[in-house]
Amino acid sequence: MAKNKGTRILITLECTECRTNINKRSAGVSRYLTQKNRRNNPQRMELKKYCPHCNKPTIHKEIK
């Protein structure tokens, strides 16, 4: 008997300002790995998290 997929899935959050900003502290793009509940949050997730490359809290969006 096969188990069903859980409601929680792993997602990657990526900084939106790192892709467009050229005046960064260091090269690279900030990414966080987290979980989300598929039933409670069916749309793409956006969180304000600290970006070490931009050296400030920025919006991080879910990527595929």
Swiss-Prot record:
Pfam families: Ribosomal_L33. Keywords: Chloroplast, Plastid, Ribonucleoprotein, Ribosomal protein. One of its GO terms (cellular component) is chloroplast. It is found in: Plastid, Chloroplast. The keyword Ribonucleoprotein applies. Disulfide bonds: none annotated. GO terms for biological process: translation. The keyword Ribonucleoprotein applies. GO terms for molecular function: structural constituent of ribosome. It comes from the Eukaryota. SUPFAM superfamilies: Zn-binding ribosomal proteins (SSF57829). InterPro entries: Ribosomal_bL33, Ribosomal_bL33_CS, Ribosomal_bL33_sf, Ribosomal_zn-bd. Belongs to the bacterial ribosomal protein bL33 family. PANTHER family: 50S RIBOSOMAL PROTEIN L33, CHLOROPLASTIC (PTHR43168), LARGE RIBOSOMAL SUBUNIT PROTEIN BL33C (PTHR43168:SF2). This is Large ribosomal subunit protein bL33c. It comes from Thalassiosira pseudonana. The lineage of its organism: Eukaryota, Sar, Stramenopiles, Ochrophyta, Bacillariophyta.
